[in-house]
Structures are given as structure tokens and as C-alpha cells.
Amino acid sequence: MTQFTLSRRGLLGAASAVLLPSVACASTPKRKYDEITDVLVVGSGFAGMAAALAAAEAGAKVMVIEKMSVLGGNSAISGGMFAVPGSSVQKEQGIDDSPEKLMADMTRIGQGLGDPELIRFVCEKAAETFEWTRKTMGVEWNTHLTGKGGHSAPRCMVTKQGTGQGILGPCAEKLKALGVPLRTRVYMEKIFREEDGRVTGVQVRQGWRFGKPESGKVKTIGITRGIVLAFGGFGADVKYRKRLDPKLGEAFLTTNQPGATAEGLRMASRIGANVIQADWIQCLPSCSPAEKGMGMASHFATIAGSLFGVWVDSQTSRRFVDEFGDRKVCTDAILGVINRGGKALAVADQNGVDEMEVVRPGLVAKILKSGALRKFDSLKDLADAYQLDLKTLEGTVARYNELLASGKDKDFNRRFDKRAKALGKAPFYVSEMSPKVHHCMGGVATNVTTAVLDVETDQPIPGLFAAGECVGGIHGAVRIGACAVMDCLVNGRQAGLSAAKNKL
């Protein structure tokens, strides 16, 4: 694997310059709080819930606060897919994979911008954390292994429920059984850092309502061991993301829930947390313009379409990209099609849909019912519906089948799935694709213990930890699909353990 020697300071980009704070420490190290807990977790997605469970298991008194009216954040609406290199499931199925192989994938796709130590940690701890979700959380996984664009091996598994709720639900039940309060509509509006550098608590608004900044009753919560920041990314914050990347303005929809905004990152910055790589913002290329938010059709495009079918430019009736490419490659290619006045179409046949049924049972029927997926009895019907040139489309399918049979994609260098069959078994299925803002690769800088690093000293801020999408420096320029769940669960668990063991 290629080795990179850039320091964290060397990774600072334009986004960090925007966020450089003037550190405002409290005037007194002894502050009175309305309520005290050992560990406070801010956010209730995968990272936050994993942190809370790990801290509670370690014997800490834990509290979880969530600003929205429901738990889960983006995790609740995610596809619930976990990349696990070197898993027991892979070994049972005879698949050769390792943490080192995923490290190489993440480094390559991330353009070398991810911190090698952080990448190594999540990859090496993924299999152990996967078993923890099964045995401790009680998560049930569909053990049919699949891939996503950028992965060099089939290592991804989906919850049996088919969404992130398959993780959050069991974890919430465990936390309730342990007596951990899960408080919704509690908005963190200030982090207190003392003159000696320690973080000792937060100011919140209880009963807060989204969109009404001054709502709720002001309270303070102190901590004896640590705060875990797990408030997620800012994909729904148009003003903030546009400031970092002017291209991502109002014209771009998002897969994120409305609460994915940037104020948590600003608060961390104000007390001296280093914020890195915040201008690396990812789009999910395979989304349907016919659906709001994340939708369901993106799963068709990335499973049936990219593993077992083709993506076609409506203007040329030909393939236009490696369908199994990383998200930036695919997003740029799809936007190119759209900007030229065409439509980017994910096409699969019945074989592809049958394969998708194994990974996500029942989902195709739901997408068809929503109207975001269309079904055709023949290629001619499909071509007529989208004004494609039938002879060219038939040639595209024939060429794809020829390349598949040879085992080498000479046109786009796609890695063919071993289960893929010749494209041609009617009926045929199509979804239109239009990228939506999806994931923020930047955030607060941390070390492998998940301690948040100070912008001036590059040393841990005592009492402050972070995990999940609010952390930068792991994925680099591009995140590979299914690695967010891995990142959140591995680092969330570590953050909970680190906070529980910490003494202020």
C-alpha cells in the first residue's frame, strides 16, 4: 500500500482557514451545572449510539442528547450496509480479503488524503466491531456479501431489516435496558472549555424545535469523564456547504435529513478544535430525481445497475462510465450527461433484479410502486420510452456481454462481479440518476483514540472525543460506500470507551 507522510497540519485546506477560531475559554475552572453525567453523547446516529453503549458497558453513567424530535439522524434513513474486511462471514464463504486490502482501497479512492493511522484503525477493528453488533447490540445481518464502487472484494453486508434502523433499534433497546436516557429535542448551543484546557460541559436548550433557534429552556450539563461529539455532517446546510464548495448550492438536493447542519462543527471550532478537509463534500451519484431525499432507487442503480447491468447516456444510447467506479468518478460522469442535456439511466434485466432481491428482499417492488423504477418487456419498449436509438442500445448490450464473457472491460475497466450473467433476460428495468449531496468527509481532527485535537497545539483537548461524520481525515477526498457505517460503529465504540476511561 502506498504510504503517505502528510501531517494533520499538512492536510489543512481552505475549509480550515474559514473555520479558524479565536479560542474562548471560560473565566473560571469551576462551573456550576444543572445536571451532571459521566459521559455525554451529542447525537444519536450510529456513532453516538455505539459510543453510548460502549461507555455504559464500561460502567459510566451516560446520557444521549439529540436535537431533532426523533432518534437516529441520517443513520435512521441510511441503507444500513457495513463493509467488514476479513470477516467471519467472508471466511465461511471462502472469500480472500483483509483489513490491508480495504486500507489500500480507501487510500487509493481517497486520493491519499486520509490519515493512514485512522484508516488502519477502522479497517483492523471492523471485524471485531461487526461481531460486537451481533453479540452485544443484537443486530441481525443478511450475510449475502456484496460490493460497492471502489471495493476490491465483496465485503459488505446489509441489516436484515434493510435500513439503518436494523442497527439503531436493537442498540436503543440495549441502552434503555441499561438505564441510559435518550433525550430528543435537546439542542447543544455551547461547549464549555476551561482555562486549563479541559472541556467540562455544555449548554443546551431542552424542548428545542428545529427551525426555531431560540426555542426551548436553557440548561447546562456537566461531565466528569468526557463528551462525545457525534452530531454528524452538514449535507442539508446549503448556506454552509455552498460557502465551502460554491457548486453545491440550492440546485443540488440532498439525501440528508433536515437536521444535518453545521452548527455543531462551528461550536467545536470556537473552543479550539481543529477542523480539517471540510470542503470535501460527496454526492451520491445514483439517486433518482423522482424521489425525495435518499429514496430507494439508488439501491437499484448501485446493485442491479452497477453490478449486473449497465449505465446508459440517453443521448448516445451507450455506456459512459465504469458503473463500479467510486462516487466522485460516477458523479462527475452523470453530471456530464445531464449538463449535455441527456439522462443517465441505470439499466438491468431480470437476472440483475433477482440478484438484488437476495441483498435487499422486497425492495424492487417498492421502488416500482413509487414510480422511480420502470419495467419494460423488451429493449425496444425501453428504447421507445426514453427515445434511445434501438440499434445502438442493442449494440451496447452486445458489447457489454462480450466484455463480460472475456472477463475484462476494455472500455471502462470495470471490475465484473463473478455472479454477473449476460444482459438480456426480459423484463428490463430502468431508473434515472441525478446526484444529491450525501456525505461530508471533513470535520474535527482526532487521533486513533478519538480524542479531538486542538488547532494550536495539535494535542488532545481533555475531555472531548468525536466519532462519525463529524470527524475529518479518515476518508480523504472520496468515501467508499458502506465505509461510513464501519467508521461510525468502530470509532463510535472507541469514543465511548475512551470517554468512559477518561478522568478530568
Q: Where do the protein language model's features map onto the residues?
A:
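N-terminal export signals
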Residues: T2-T5, G10-S27, L393
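Beta1/beta-strand and adjacent pyrophosphate-binding region of the FAD-binding site
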Residues: Y33-G45
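Conserved N-terminal/central alpha/beta ligand/cofactor-binding core
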Residues: K67-P181, R185-K190, R198, V310-R319, ...
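Conserved beta-strand-loop-beta-strand element in the redox core of flavoprotein oxidoreductases
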Residues: R193-T220
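Glycine-rich loop(s) and the adjacent beta-strand/alpha-helix scaffold that form part
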Residues: R209-F210, E214-G216, G222-S288, N491-Q494
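A conserved FAD-binding loop/helix module that cradles the flavin
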Residues: G249-N256, H475-A499
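An anion/pyrophosphate-binding glycine-rich loop and adjacent beta-alpha core
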Residues: L265-R270, N274-L388
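A glycine-rich dinucleotide-binding beta-alpha-beta segment and adjacent secondary-structure elements
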Residues: T392-V478
